[in-house]
């Protein structure tokens, strides 16, 4: 039986996105796109092979990056990765 939005918890979304591509929007018109390696209850997230995007322009690639949770606006699993 498919889950409905009403019974989906935020941490479940992150758990299901582990080892998958995600897009993270953060304060300051920045985004990070990469493979979700880990997270905690404070929304601190670790990405592998992460691209930093500022104002729509790719500014660099990181092997591994930690994004501090208090800067996170949203986390979105990439299309096709939302099972």
Curated annotation (Swiss-Prot):
Chain ranges of the Sm domain: 9-81
Any single GO CC term annotated in Swiss-Prot or TrEMBL for this entry: Sm-like protein family complex
Keywords: Ribonucleoprotein
Tagged with keyword Iron: no
CDD domains listed in its UniProt record: archaeal_Sm1
GO biological process: mRNA splicing, via spliceosome
Record carries keyword Acyltransferase: no
Superkingdom of origin: Archaea
UniProt GO MF annotations: RNA binding
Pfam families noted in UniProt: LSM
Family: Belongs to the snRNP Sm proteins family.
HAMAP family recorded: Lsm_RuxX
Protein name: Putative snRNP Sm-like protein
């Amino acid at each position: 039986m498919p889950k409905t939005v009403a019974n989906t918890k935020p941490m479940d979304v992150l758990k299901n996105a582990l080892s998958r591509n995600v897009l993270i929007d953060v304060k300051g018109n920045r985004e990070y796109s990469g493979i979700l390696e880990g997270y905690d209850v404070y929304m601190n997230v670790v990405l592998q092979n992460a691209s930093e995007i500022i104002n729509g322009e790719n500014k660099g690639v990181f092997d591994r990056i930690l994004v501090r949770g208090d800067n996170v606006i949203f986390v979105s699993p990439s299309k096709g990765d939302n099972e």
